[in-house]
Structures are given as structure tokens and as C-alpha cells.
Regions:
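Hydrophobic anchor at the beta1->P-loop junction of P-loop NTPases
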Residues: 10
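P-loop (Walker A) phosphate-binding loop of NTP-binding proteins
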Residues: 13
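ATP-binding Walker
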Residues: 16
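Conserved phosphate-donor/acceptor-positioning beta-strand/loop module used by diverse small-molecule
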Residues: 98-103, 112-137
């Protein structure tokens, strides 16, 4: 029987580079498994079902909630986002390290269910750099950008509840720091 895997909670403000960091980590360590969230939102151009998210209907989402198949969920605007329970438990039982890219409220819920989970907060070098990254991404209008930056400030406030804080000033350096943290845990 294989040793139980490690659950890693990966949070940080929108635009901090979580997805890119996750891709680097998984490339560097094939034992890492990225959990894919479910969502009721429309698929964006270039997104692939089962790779970026599992895109499901609101009725299917509600059915999964009713059956206890969702570890945690949150509503953003009109859309629901959640973490499916079955694949996470399967990968942990197989000895894989499972990384959940998750917002701070969800991380707090998961930490209560899985107290041994390791929580890592990805921090921008500064709010100015974060704003620049979000503007460069070009996916938000000005109102959305202001809202995201306000949410980012709130999330950064809660970063003290995490086991580790990693500043993403350089993707490779941040990835190496996360790998170093995980090798010690």
C-alpha cells in the first residue's frame, strides 16, 4: 500500500501567477497532481473542459453538492466554483501530492477538513506590480480591475493564516522556493 499523499493548498490574488507556477511545479515533479475545479460559468476562448475546469450545469453542480461530492464551493457573481472530492481523495490514497488552487475562504474550509494540508500563499512583490500584471493580461474592464485589486488586498491580509508565503517576483525562483518548502514537509 502506498503512503498517503500530501494535500497542498495554493492561494493568492488574481494575476499573481498561480496557474503558471502550478504548470512549472507539475513539470518539475510528476508526482504532483493539480486538482481541476468544477464551475457553472461559460467556457472562455481557449479553455478546455477537463483541463482548465470541468464546465457543468447549475443543476449538475447542485446535484454534486446534495450528494456530498464537493469539498468546498464558492459563488462569484452568478457562477459557482468548487473542488470535486472524489479525485482528490483518490490521488491522496495513491500517494500523490495534490495541489488545490483555491481562494482564501475555500482554503480555510479545506484546512478544517484536512488539518495536515499545507497552505502556501503566493504573494505579489507589490500591489503596483500586481496591478500591472492584471492590466497586461487585458481580461478585465476598469471596474473589474478595481474590484480584483480590492479583493487582492483582503486576500493578502489573510495570508498570515497560511503555513508559508512565497513572493512571486520571478516564476522560476518562486517555483524553486515552493519545491524547497515541499521537500522539507
Amino acid at each position: 500500500m502506498s503512503e498517503q499523499g500530501k494535500l497542498i493548498l495554493f492561494s493568492g490574488p488574481s494575476g499573481v501567477g498561480k496557474d503558471t507556477l502550478l504548470d512549472i511545479l507539475i513539470r518539475k515533479n510528476p508526482n504532483f497532481q493539480k486538482s481541476i475545479s468544477i464551475t457553472t460559468r461559460e467556457r472562455r476562448e481557449g479553455e478546455v473542459d477537463g483541463v482548465d475546469y470541468y464546465f457543468i450545469t447549475p443543476d449538475d453542480f447542485e446535484a454534486m453538492l446534495d450528494c456530498g461530492e464537493v469539498l468546498e464551493f464558492a459563488k462569484y457573481g452568478k457562477n459557482l466554483y468548487g473542488t470535486p472530492k472524489k479525485p482528490v481523495d483518490k490521488w491522496l490514497a495513491e500517494g500523490k501530492s495534490v495541489i488545490l488552487k483555491i481562494e482564501v475562504q475555500g482554503a480555510a474550509k479545506i484546512k478544517k477538513m484536512y488539518p495536515d494540508a499545507l497552505a502556501i500563499f503566493i504573494m505579489p512583490p507589490s500591489m503596483e506590480i500586481l496591478e500591472h500584471r492584471l492590466r497586461r493580461r487585458g481580461t478585465e474592464n476598469e471596474d473589474d480591475l478595481v474590484r480584483r485589486l480590492s479583493i487582492a488586498r483582503d486576500e493578502i491580509e489573510k495570508s498570515r493564516d497560511y503555513d508559508y508565503i512565497v513572493i512571486n517576483d520571478s516564476l522560476e525562483a518562486a517555483a524553486d522556493e515552493v519545491l524547497n518548502i515541499l521537500s522539507k514537509e
